[in-house]
């Protein structure tokens, strides 16, 4: 198969591993910078171009779209969909998962476990917003934050109000969530591929940090999921419409609580901690599933 990865940095561990896995299976996997692609939007022969030539003849694309370029990245994926090229994760699904508020609303509608979450624009009702989230301590998150950046634990009502006012003063949108104390600064990252959990790890926050992101100095170890956790991860990926997803959960007193669903999960931490060749499982899924013209959206979403 001839495959194309949409990614800004070909040297990232995850991207190198996907190339290795593809080549080991006899496939060709090119990596081109998403931001350097451009489009010919026409009715009869839509094109994506790169350095003056048309990108054609690909059996499938593997989008690895960074959060900072979501809008343009989705447009490029959508253009390939209009050309009938199969996408590992489709543009509409990527958009759902990147919009934190929308993803929480969709997961909530599906009846999946979530931390109690409040969202408001006006700061005049901050006390009620904090009460909705169960009262202090609360976790305050930037809607656009990634890798633990823009996430604050406010342990008192006064500090919570100060943080909310500061964020709103900067004209950024935030979520206020209940603090899940029983999680103990740890979360679970699962990788779902084609409707199956292929790997799972526990991430423990660094000493004194409630955030468990490995980018923030956390540690990782292999973990055995409960049947409910496994089912929750699979259902979350399905709600988003993602063929490949990183689903982050907390272990609450009443079951798993979804924190985030990621459309471009990193592979380094989870492959190292579990020993699972996640990259190979992703390429195996592409190999078995990619069919030209099979894209569900065809660029309509």
Swiss-Prot record:
Binds 2 magnesium or manganese ions per subunit. GO terms for biological process: protein modification process; SOS response; translation. GO terms for molecular function: ATP binding; metal ion binding; ribosomal S6-glutamic acid ligase activity. InterPro entries: ATP-grasp (IPR011761), ATP-grasp_RimK-type (IPR013651), ATP_grasp_subdomain_1 (IPR013815), RimK (IPR023533), Rimk_N (IPR041107), Rp_bS6_RimK/Lys_biosynth_LsyX (IPR004666). GO terms for cellular component: cytoplasm. Pfam families: RimK (PF08443), Rimk_N (PF18030). Mn(2+) 1 binds at residues 248, 260. PANTHER family: RIBOSOMAL PROTEIN BS6--L-GLUTAMATE LIGASE (PTHR21621:SF7), RIBOSOMAL PROTEIN S6 MODIFICATION PROTEIN (PTHR21621). Belongs to the RimK family. This is Probable alpha-L-glutamate ligase.
């Amino acid at each position: 198969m001839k495959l194309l990865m949409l990614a800004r940095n070909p040297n990232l561990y995850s991207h190198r591993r996907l190339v290795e896995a593809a080549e080991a299976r006899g496939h060709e996997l090119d990596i081109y910078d998403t931001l350097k692609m451009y489009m010919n939007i026409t009715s009869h022969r839509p094109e994506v171009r790169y350095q003056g030539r048309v990108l054609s003849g690909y059996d499938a694309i593997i989008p690895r779209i960074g959060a900072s370029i979501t809008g343009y990245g989705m447009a490029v994926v959508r253009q390939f969909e209009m050309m009938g090229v199969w996408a590992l994760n489709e543009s509409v699904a990527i958009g759902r998962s990147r919009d934190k508020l929308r993803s929480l609303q969709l997961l909530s509608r599906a009846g999946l476990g979530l931390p109690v979450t409040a969202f408001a624009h006006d700061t005049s009702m901050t006390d009620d917003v904090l009460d909705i989230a169960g009262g202090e301590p609360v976790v305050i998150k930037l809607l656009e934050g990634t890798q633990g950046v823009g996430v604050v634990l406010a342990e008192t009502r006064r500090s919570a109000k100060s943080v909310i006012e500061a964020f709103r003063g900067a004209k950024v949108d935030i979520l206020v969530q209940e603090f899940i104390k029983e999680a103990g600064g740890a979360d679970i990252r699962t990788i779902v591929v084609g409707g199956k959990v292929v790997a799972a790890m526990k991430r423990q926050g660094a000493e004194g940090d409630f955030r468990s992101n490995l980018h923030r100095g956390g540690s990782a170890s292999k973990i055995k999921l409960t049947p409910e956790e496994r089912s929750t991860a699979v259902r979350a990926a399905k709600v988003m419409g993602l063929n490949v997803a990183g689903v982050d959960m907390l272990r609450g007193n009443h079951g798993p609580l979804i924190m985030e669903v990621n459309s471009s999960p990193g592979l380094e931490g989870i492959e190292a901690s579990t020993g699972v060749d996640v990259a190979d499982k992703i390429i195996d899924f592409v190999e078995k599933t990619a069919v030209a013209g099979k894209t569900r959206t065809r660029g309509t979403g």
